Amino acid sequence: MSEVQDYKSRLSDPASAKFETLSYLPALTADEIRQQVAYIVSKGWNPAVEHTEPENAFGNYWYMWKLPMFGETDVDTILKEAERCHKRNPHNHVRIVGYDNFKQSQGTSLVVYRGKTV
């Protein structure tokens, strides 16, 4: 029987923190982020940009940047809003969320900018 490995992420070590599903993979390139946003658009989900302080990243509440972009289908517009949010809140984590109207829940979300860890 093999031994169970310890989970290496610790709250006391901010560099080890993981966020969202894709955080266990290598960092996404700009093109890969673009593909993820294109997927959100292709599913008909409503994109939104959210941000929070690194110390609150594990909480359920992230601040919404403006309103959700209802019906937005231009990937560049969505990415520019995420960039504007990051420039306005440079120390915060910024994520893009795809809201699924049919299931009335988040279809997906991914952190596109990581803030400065404490």
Curated annotation (Swiss-Prot):
Family of the protein in this entry: Belongs to the RuBisCO small chain family.
Superkingdom of the source? Bacteria
Q: Drop me one GO molecular function for this one.
A: ribulose-bisphosphate carboxylase activity
Q: What is said about its interaction partners and assembly? A: Heterohexadecamer of 8 large and 8 small subunits.
Q: What else is known?
A: The basic functional RuBisCO is composed of a large chain homodimer in a 'head-to-tail' conformation. In form I RuBisCO this homodimer is arranged in a barrel-like tetramer with the small subunits forming a tetrameric 'cap' on each end of the 'barrel'.
HAMAP family attached here?
RuBisCO_S_bact (MF_00859)
Q: What is this protein called?
A: Ribulose bisphosphate carboxylase small subunit 2
Disulfide pairs?
Answer: none
The record's function comment reads:
RuBisCO catalyzes two reactions: the carboxylation of D-ribulose 1,5-bisphosphate, the primary event in carbon dioxide fixation, as well as the oxidative fragmentation of the pentose substrate. Both reactions occur simultaneously and in competition at the same active site. Although the small subunit is not catalytic it is essential for maximal activity.
A Pfam family found in this protein is RuBisCO_small
BP term (GO), one: reductive pentose-phosphate cycle
Question: Which interval of the chain is the signal sequence?
Answer: none
Key words, A-Z: Calvin cycle, Carbon dioxide fixation
Q: Which SMART domains does this one have?
A: RuBisCO_small
InterPro entries to which the protein is assigned, alphabetical: RuBisCO_ssu (IPR024681), RuBisCO_ssu_dom (IPR000894), RuBisCO_ssu_sf (IPR036385)
